[in-house]
Amino acid sequence: MFYTETYDVIVIGGGHAGTEAALAPARMGFKTLLLTHNVDTLGQMSCNPAIGGIGKGHLVKEVDAMGGLMAHAADKAGIQFRTLNSSKGPAVRATRAQADRVLYRQAVRTALENQPNLDIFQQEATDILIEQDRVTGVSTKMGLIFRAKSVVLTAGTFLAGKIHIGLENYEGGRAGDPASVNLSHRLRDLGLRVDRLKTGTPPRIDARTINFDILAKQHGDEVLPMFSFMGSVDDHPQQIPCYITYTNEQTHEVIRNNLDRSPMYTGVIEGIGPRYCPSIEDKVMRFSDRNSHQIYLEPEGLTSNEVYPNGISTSLPFDVQMGIVNSMKGLENARIVKPGYAIEYDYFDPRDLKPTLETKSISGLFFAGQINGTTGYEEAAAQGLLAGINAGLYVQEKDAWYPRRDQSYTGVLVDDLCTLGTKEPYRVFTSRAEYRLLLREDNADIRLTPIAHELGLIDDARWARFNQKMENIEQERQRLRNIWLHPRSEYLEEANKVLGSPLVREASGEDLLRRPEMTYDILTSLTPYKPAMEDKEAVEQVEIAIKYQGYIEHQQEEIEKQKRHENTAIPANFDYSKVSSLSNEVRAKLEQHRPVSISQASRISGITPAAISIILVNLKKQGMLKRGE
């Protein structure tokens, strides 16, 4: 049976990738349908109740800069905010928030239900309809057929999901939700490369059974940060602390004595788990020299008694989980309300995707989130936004868009996935970005909001606020450039009190601000440079731009060199078999990856500079050597 409406874009899945993937084309004016197996779990935080962190906070800011939802929802739901690496340089500072699960889900659902051009329908998708290698729609469990010109699949851990607790296992997409078995079989039939990954979650503990009085308390920042560039401190709900405990030798002994009941250590689980979020049994065995591990007790919400013990993800049997929990300080009498578990699921090789997240073999079909081998809400949201944008552009047969590595962490994420693939759950770190001084949290809007405006992703209010900020930055920099202090100035004595070394020649406000001991606040406390600007975001940009000017200019020079290769496109129909001077190994890798540019080809493992030169020569010979704008 055909549904009465025909859509431009259908998004399958209502998690963090799916919600962003649905909102983006709807904001661009495309008629969009979000298909979910349960409308009550839209925006569900399936694992840890937190948003952001190192690298991840950068992604949240980027999603927000392009009109996405995650930052707004995190501001509405955040019950503890912290700026990580606050004592380090601006490139690695990152925002993190503990979130109230209920408030977060409410913020997501409210945004979805009030978005024009977006419909929501509760049904399990069981088949993706394809004609002549082109997607035409989706069919559901009840036999309903939805027609669309493009489809974004954001299935999370649901594709052939299998939950493990001890040596027992059963089908499931997450605790309490069924797996998508039929859809998994259908995707395997399409000939896409598929493998299995694994992730896990810890048991949840009843807060009423924890002795918080003997535990260390961790408060959030006193000056509360915000995720959204349009946010306000007034958006934040009540702030509450987290607590800290530790595993000990007794904990580790419980784990070691029960490894024969672990699905990981008995070979029942074959999927590879996240390297940077290992299970507690993995930590105990891999770091056998350590006699304790720090565990954060994170509240799940203002109205919930559930506590998330961050650091003891496990798939051991329930009785062993009880032994682990009760062995720790403050948790001697703690009660588990939800057991921890591991989940195995299908993911598809992201090297079979274009950088737009469209599959190379099926036109109009896009993948986003854990289906591409990533882990984390933030990585999923960034991919969902990108896939949703390009699903809309595909409908209009417009040029696709994707960010470069020098433009955003989303660009780094997508390039890593599509060029190198992954054999383990991939997460973003600042260390993955070679241009991280330019890819800071604080300038995500400067990097991406103009692009979002061109794509139709942001409203007039955001665009006006952005332009006002840019105007404030330029005006303040101009003001500081034009105010000079010289050794004969009547204000010299005042200035020398705060300068590390006395002023011996004239200097502008910008010159003074470049000094290591000088800050914007100190500078604008001096009489010649009063008053300070009220726009704190603009102040931050002024200070960073001036203090790091040399480093920033150096990175920009490197980027310009790299762009020459990035803009040298390799046509999709380029025949590597006709390039006789390439080795068989190199030719096979290029045929497998089908890079879209010389730059992407150069990042494939085993592709040498000599091979790149050969490709360039052959592109020129065949009249295919074209450079992008």
UniProtKB/Swiss-Prot annotation:
GO terms for molecular function: flavin adenine dinucleotide binding. Keywords: Cytoplasm, FAD, Flavoprotein, NAD, tRNA processing. InterPro entries: FAD/NAD-bd_sf (IPR036188), GIDA_C_N (IPR049312), MnmG (IPR004416), MnmG-rel (IPR002218), MnmG-rel_CS (IPR020595), MnmG_C (IPR026904), MnmG_C_subdom (IPR047001), MnmG_C_subdom_sf (IPR044920). NAD(+) binds at residues 273-287. Pfam families: GIDA (PF01134), GIDA_C_1st (PF21680), SAM_GIDA_C (PF13932). It is found in: Cytoplasm. Signal peptide: none annotated. The keyword Iron does not apply. NAD-binding protein involved in the addition of a carboxymethylaminomethyl (cmnm) group at the wobble position (U34) of certain tRNAs, forming tRNA-cmnm(5)s(2)U34. Homodimer. Heterotetramer of two MnmE and two MnmG subunits. This is tRNA uridine 5-carboxymethylaminomethyl modification enzyme MnmG.
